[in-house]
Amino acid sequence: ALYPQVKMVCQMELTSHLLTTAAYGTMKNSENELAEQLIEQTGDNTLTLMDKGYYSPGLLNTWSLAGEHRHWMIPLRKGAQYEEIRKLGKGDHLVKLNISPQARKKWPGLGNEVTARLLTVTRKGKVCHLLTSMTDAIRFPGTYTGADARSCKYGTTSE
């Protein structure tokens, strides 16, 4: 390009739309690399809604382990590989995400699998599949997880 370009990833508080933190780099940086920089600025006791483009078990696992009750929710990516561990309720499953050798190389502490929760919700006639780190079904009942239209906006849908 004939002019400077910057790639930027921002974190926004959902109700006020105020930006809480941002990371930027060159066009050579991936958005996931920039999102990694937001981990330390993310507060405890939060739920971060992510676009499906940020699907990376290493990033998501690191995000939730970086503090107290730092949860994430992300639309299930088409073709994502998972194994159902058990059913928690209607449209609510505990799943195991298998980790690729490439991801284990990039994230050495990751291990062979990550446990997550798969929620299936219907909004305006569309079925949305959402992954979240809120695996405790007693503390976070399916109706309380925040799985709403905002979460489904960029999600995997089916009729």
Where are these regions (language model features)?
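Single, function-defining residue in the core of a domain
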Residues: 2-159
